[in-house]
Amino acid sequence: MKWVTRAKVKVDRVACPWLIRTFIDRDADFLFVPVDEVESVARKTGAIPYDVAGVELGHHGEECSFDAIVKKYNVKDKAVDRLALIVRGADTPRRDLTPESRGLEAIAEGFKRLAAAQGYDDQETLRRERHLYDALYLYCGGDAEKLRRD
């Protein structure tokens, strides 16, 4: 599967690829483009758009894109449900939704600044933050056997 979203990833646009590669498609490809190009790139490449306004796998009401993907792909995992609350709090104005949400938002902002300072791209951000989400998943009671080993 191929996916596309806005460039300059943070929280939801990092958590969603982690979710997809862990529970839906381990070989998923992700494209990061300027927001005004997401729709056209999705059409041209057949990529599934996420975390942009007006798409199925975006924010709806108080929920974020992570929630939408969990529902659409029927991910049934209690630790993912708990992680979804943390991500939702970090990615929406509801920072107090969980005690961990503010911390995740702060760490995500730090990674964003690190990427800007060191000049690495969104793919590298995904690579660097993958273990953060693995750790959060285990903190939420997840099964280590479900995590990618590559």
Residues covered by each model-derived region:
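Extended, well-folded catalytic/binding cores that form a central cleft or groove in large enzyme
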Residues: 1-8, 17-150
